[in-house]
């Protein structure tokens, strides 16, 4: 029950992270991915993925939980839909790997693997809208990757600290 409550809290944090948005062309800059990382690191593959999948499902049902207060299935089939589905698969992979070993280097490696999945799906879908893979990469990857790597590092540090506090309790 405790893990379900934590998953619900992380779903809410992902929503808040989506609402903190700076429009940059077809893909806005948000804090969603930061909370996707954090949920996967802290909750692991099962509950981290549940938190992210719940977020995507709430948006698909029409609740305005996505970036720029958008919601509805049209967002999932739009230019940023690949990133949203990538969040689910990325959270699973990050959580799966993070459960194997609790170390900063391992968390970074698992985060990079998850981020790669998020970007691969995101750019793949975005390409269908911009009709040019180079443009999809230049607008859906290049402006964000360094910021997302910073978010990954911060999420890993926070997650390790939270886990240490939980063990000490």
Curated annotation (Swiss-Prot):
Subcellular location, record wording: Cell inner membrane
Pfam families: BioY (PF02632)
Keywords: Cell inner membrane, Cell membrane, Membrane, Transmembrane, Transmembrane helix, Transport
One of the record's GO molecular function terms: biotin transmembrane transporter activity
Transmembrane segments: 9-29, 47-67, 75-95, 106-126, 139-159
A GO CC term assigned to this protein in UniProt: plasma membrane
Family: Belongs to the BioY family.
Oligomeric form and interacting partners: Forms a stable energy-coupling factor (ECF) transporter complex composed of 2 membrane-embedded substrate-binding proteins (S component, RibU, BioY), 2 ATP-binding proteins (A component) and 2 transmembrane proteins (T component) upon coexpression in E.coli. A stable subcomplex with both A and T components are also isolated. This complex interacts with at least 2 substrate-specific components, BioY and RibU.
Reported function: Substrate-binding (S) component of an energy-coupling factor (ECF) ABC-transporter complex. Probably a biotin-binding protein that interacts with the energy-coupling factor (ECF) ABC-transporter complex. Unlike classic ABC transporters this ECF transporter provides the energy necessary to transport a number of different substrates. The substrates themselves are bound by transmembrane, not extracytoplasmic soluble proteins.
Protein name: Biotin transporter BioY
Organism: Thermotoga maritima (strain ATCC 43589 / DSM 3109 / JCM 10099 / NBRC 100826 / MSB8)
